[in-house]
Amino acid sequence: QYDAAFLGDTAQKRIYLTFDAGYENGCTAQILDTLQKHHAPAAFFLVGNYIERNPDLVRRMAQEGHTVGNHTYHHWDMSKIGEMEQFRQELESLEMLYRDTTGQELAKFYRPPQGIYSEKNLEMAQQLGYHTVFWSLAYVDWLQDDQPTSEQAYAKLIPRIHNGAVVLLHSTSQTNAAILDSLLTRWEEMGYSFGEISELFPAG
């Protein structure tokens, strides 16, 4: 319903890597290097100030074949927005900024800031032509003053991986940047491959 998904095909050993990027703190280049090494596509959900401050990284994401999705311009609590005009402005402002930065069109994938949404939001996103992308596997990786150890991250992420998983990671996490190479290797050894989030919406 409302063209939203949190899970891929559970009959396939395929997983979907997604990164939420509210700001840049020096981890993204390493993450992109690791994704390139593994030939792993990912989706990056970006906000306005991220694109404004890091145009080179955003262009690199696009050039290296990753999906860039809409995390709204201001990263507000969108559940408080019930008017289409304001909702549209949040998404279309980011579309324009991305177009000006990369010369490309932003992919029509939306992730609500902080995962907070109303049913009305999902309906409005759909009316604007967006697929809403949630997730089925995440862990507390966004606290800068309380980053998980590598061991804690592995313990959360490796046993809980599953067929069709949409994995939410934050690109601001030093732990994620440090472990990503070995994490992807481990998942590959378990028989998983990495898919494009467009596969979550086979009809469209």
Please provide the spans of the model-predicted regions.
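Low-complexity, Gly/Ser/Thr/Pro-rich intrinsically disordered linker/tail segments
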Residues: S173, T185-G204
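Solvent-exposed coil/turn segments that connect beta secondary-structure elements
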Residues: N49, Y73, G115, T172-Q174
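Short secondary-structure boundary segments
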Residues: Q114, S136-L137, H170-S171, S198-E199
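Alpha-helical scaffold elements lining the catalytic groove of polysaccharide deacetylases
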Residues: N25-C27, W76-T102, I116-N163, N176-A178
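Active-site beta->alpha N-cap acidic-glycine motif
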Residues: Q1-G82, Q86, E90-D100, L106-A107, ...
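Structured helix-beta-strand junction loops
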Residues: H38, E64-G65, L128, N163-G164, ...
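Conserved, mostly hydrophobic/aromatic
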Residues: D20, L35, F44, V68-H71, ...
